Amino acid sequence: MDDRLTIFIISDSLGVTARTIAKACIQQFPNHDNWQFERYSNINNKELLDKVLEKAKDKNVCLMFSLVDDDLARYAQERSEEEHFVYVDLLSNVIKAMSKLSGVEPLGQPGLLRKLDKHYFKRVEAIEFAVKYDDGKDPRGILKADLILLGISRTSKTPLSMYLADKHLKVVNIPIVPEVPLPKELNEVSPKKIVGLTNSVERLSQVRKERLRSLGVSGTASYANKDRIYEEAAYAEEVMRKLKCPIINVSDKAIEETATIILEMIKENQL
């Protein structure tokens, strides 16, 4: 028999949860480096289970079952008793307790935690969209977006884009810089799809100085200069006025608070 200590992870899904539990448990033992794992995924019938148990016969093994099918879990326990294996059924007792408490029979379907539904894909698509079109990288995204955020530097455009992407919205954010022409595509979308973001000059100066320091640059650079920020803010206000888009001052607002305001706007405009 192989003297090494082995944990067999046996699951009718991927077995990720069971492996995480097992790894957490072995940390309690000083010799945990001597343990090894073997994971057997998608073990969803007795024939497959028997093949795994056959492999366990010649090893110093602990079996960890993560089986939601009640019949298969019961069979695994019976076979383990017959072969005198050390084993743990991770799910059966928990599922039975929940069923007893709720009065509802469990579905017995493996992999439900990891099933990818349309909402998941929509969220991922929105996040990828936000990354692709962040900071005006590609103005073509404006015509594809659910929402366009405009603002000068450090007005929370990127974190807002990502937060709203988590709500399944495809968001483009465009920086406003006096010396840089705005994308012509902005004139081709409804003002209701555009939101302008502003901030107080004092707050912008403070945030920009902190940003420069984090980059190892002097806080006296023009980027953080109040006169420069006044110039940018005035230009941005003029742009937003011409576009006739709503404007939100993000000063002293959490990302979640600003996002809630935007979501309410979208709801009102039925976009």
Curated annotation (Swiss-Prot):
Q: Which domain of life is it from?
A: Bacteria
Q: What Pfam families does its record include?
A: Kinase-PPPase
What this protein catalyses is: N(tele)-phospho-L-histidyl/L-threonyl-[pyruvate, phosphate dikinase] + ADP = N(tele)-phospho-L-histidyl/O-phospho-L-threonyl-[pyruvate, phosphate dikinase] + AMP + H(+); N(tele)-phospho-L-histidyl/O-phospho-L-threonyl-[pyruvate, phosphate dikinase] + phosphate + H(+) = N(tele)-phospho-L-histidyl/L-threonyl-[pyruvate, phosphate dikinase] + diphosphate
Which residues bind ADP per the record?
G151, I152, S153, R154, T155, S156, K157, T158
- Offer an example of a GO molecular function term for this protein: ADP binding
Alphabetically ordered keywords of this record: Kinase, Nucleotide-binding, Serine/threonine-protein kinase, Transferase
Enzyme Commission number(s) of this protein: 2.7.11.32, 2.7.4.27
* Matches recorded under NCBIfam families: PRK05339.1 (NF003742)
Functionally, this protein is described as follows: Bifunctional serine/threonine kinase and phosphorylase involved in the regulation of the pyruvate, phosphate dikinase (PPDK) by catalyzing its phosphorylation/dephosphorylation.
Family listed:
Belongs to the pyruvate, phosphate/water dikinase regulatory protein family. PDRP subfamily.
Would you tell me the protein name for this molecule?
Answer: Putative pyruvate, phosphate dikinase regulatory protein
Its source organism is Streptococcus uberis (strain ATCC BAA-854 / 0140J)
